[in-house]
Amino acid sequence: MLSGPGADSQLGDPDFRRPLAPTVVCEAPAGSDDPYWSFYDEVASVQLREWLPGAPSRVLDVSGQRDRFARQMVAAGHQVIRVIGELDQLGKIPMDPANRESHPPPAGRLTAATAATWRTAGPGIAGGRGGALRSVVGDARSLDWFAPTSFDAVLAEGRALSFCLATESTLEEIHRLLRPGGQLLLCVDSLLLGLARLAEQHRWAELSDVPRADVVLVPAEDGTITRCFWPEELKAVLTSARLEVDWIRPRTVLSAEAVKRALAADMSSFPTLVRTEVELAAEREGESIGIHLIASARRPG
């Protein structure tokens, strides 16, 4: 147990106060106009574009509340089923102008089956070449309500699997949903981010346990808990779910400060910075750099 200036306030040090707001940022704050997060989003978009199947495919999107990934896939001509965790989020999805006969969901709980037929984005949404978007209400942590081998690909962007504390179980469900040869792209919190957040919260006991821990969980001020991974652990978790790992790499390598300085000096460098970042991330495959890791895996067959 620690005491003195570095101790946790709950251990009795009256002079210690936790920070009012976290300084270690896990993702773009709502409404952020920070150029770094615009850069980050564009890097994620390029990485997704390079990963997507070339032929039109049926894709399950469990990337949380942000719909930018689903719309990008629709624009590329894919049939996308997007899982929404809360019923009220369905009303926030923009309606396709070509589908004006759609109606809001009925009051009460909407099942996955009925939600799947309620809101469909027809051909041409977001410039899609025959792509379509359907949104369903359900728990992305437990996907047993989909039929086996229903999808050609699964996207778990936006740190989605870091919020699934029993990640192994969720990945086993994803394996079941993928057709043989189907692929998975995921993004999770890195161990580097987890260590930084634990240090910021002065959780020294948890930090000292990390080398011996099988799973590293990090609490947030709002009560949520996320799981972070190092590359070897992520590979082991994917392999245990009978998925073949194509690669594991950092989402970003360049520091936020370096990106901001470069953009402040010359905004026209934005495309070059994005391409450089994507190439650097691929070169640093297997390394735990930056706040997030991305991984590509597939069901054998």
Where are these regions (language model features)?
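A short glycine-rich, Lys/Arg-flanked "PGG" loop and its adjoining helix->strand segment in the class I
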Residues: 168-183
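Class I SAM-dependent methyltransferase SAM/SAH-binding core
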Residues: 60, 66-143
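Short alpha-helix
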Residues: 223-242, 248
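A short acidic, Gly/Pro-enriched loop at the edge of an enzyme's catalytic core
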Residues: 141-154
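A short SAM/SAH-binding and catalytic strip from SAM-dependent methyltransferases
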Residues: 152-166
